[in-house]
């Protein structure tokens, strides 16, 4: 699943061999104020381009939603349903519930921080796909997958819940993106789609009492290393991951195409290797 923030990136994702893309429109998505976004008027064209090339389209509606946002939330999901978007990616029960009520398919966003099978059982009534918390290790992911199979945890379609995980890109320093740095520094809430990436800046560290600057090995002390799983995708598949998501809706089309191509090739190689082992 490739990230798309412009028509150029959409075409790059298609050329790179994406099986699906995810994107946002004006509001209520986690990049609504920190990167380029489409508008409601773009939905039909995006869906048409995706269908023409045999890929699925997923619309993010995954910010914190306040009472005053409910009319906009319904308007966005109505537009998604009318344009026949494949699914919305949601993190608020209000959005999930409304989407279900009008027959719009839902995927569970990583913003929900689903990190165990019991939480997944609760949310399974709303969605057929879950983007698990990024903080999980492969052993924990496999345990959730085992519970899905053993307990027959199914979504609205009556099929077993499918696991989706981020496979490549920037990682938030906060748990599942619930960060307040942008709000503290610039009065811009990351939880409302306005992450200013404060954590990815270089910092010096001083002792407040002595005013002595500490000697640190890496100035990027609040920025985790970017995620890269291309060298163990076979292990992710064995753990039950079925959808590999690339971070980067704010990235340019060159990045989108290159990373999508690399991961598509890696998926094919892993599948071929699995078949050979069998």
Predicted stretch roles:
Residues 39-100, 105-113:
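Active-site beta->alpha loop and helix N-cap motifs at the rims of alpha/beta catalytic domains
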Residues 35-43, 93-99, 136-149, 253-255:
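Active-site-adjacent beta->alpha loops and helix N-cap segments on the catalytic face
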Residues 1-2, 21-23, 57-61, 88-90, ...:
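Hydrophobic faces of well-ordered beta-strands that scaffold small-molecule active sites
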């Amino acid at each position: 699943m490739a990230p798309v923030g412009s028509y150029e990136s959409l075409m790059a994702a298609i050329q790179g061999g994406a099986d699906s893309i995810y994107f946002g429109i004006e509001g209520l998505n986690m990049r609504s104020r920190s990167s380029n976004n489409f508008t409601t008027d773009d939905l039909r064209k995006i869906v048409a381009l995706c269908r023409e090339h045999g890929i699925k389209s997923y619309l993010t509606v995954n910010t914190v939603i306040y009472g005053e946002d409910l009319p906009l939330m319904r308007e966005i999901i109505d537009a998604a349903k009318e344009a026949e978007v494949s699914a919305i990616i949601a993190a608020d029960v209000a959005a999930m519930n409304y989407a279900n009520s009008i027959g719009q398919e839902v995927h569970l966003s990583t913003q929900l921080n689903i990190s165990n099978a019991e939480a997944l059982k609760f949310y399974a009534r709303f969605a057929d796909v879950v983007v698990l918390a990024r903080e999980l290790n492969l052993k924990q992911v496999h345990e959730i997958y085992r519970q899905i199979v053993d307990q027959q945890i199914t979504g609205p379609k009556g099929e077993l819940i499918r696991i989706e995980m981020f496979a490549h890109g920037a990682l938030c320093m906060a748990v599942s993106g619930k960060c307040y740095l942008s709000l503290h520094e610039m009065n811009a809430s990351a939880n409302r789609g306005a992450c200013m990436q404060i954590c990815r800046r270089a910092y010096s560290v001083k002792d407040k009492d002595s005013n002595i600057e500490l000697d640190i090995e890496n100035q990027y002390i609040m920025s985790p290393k970017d995620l890269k799983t291309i060298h163990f995708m076979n292990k992710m598949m064995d753990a039950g991951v079925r959808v590999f998501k690339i971070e980067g809706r704010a990235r340019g089309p060159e990045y989108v195409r290159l990373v999508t191509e690399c991961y598509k090739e890696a998926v094919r190689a892993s599948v071929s290797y699995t078949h050979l082992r069998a």
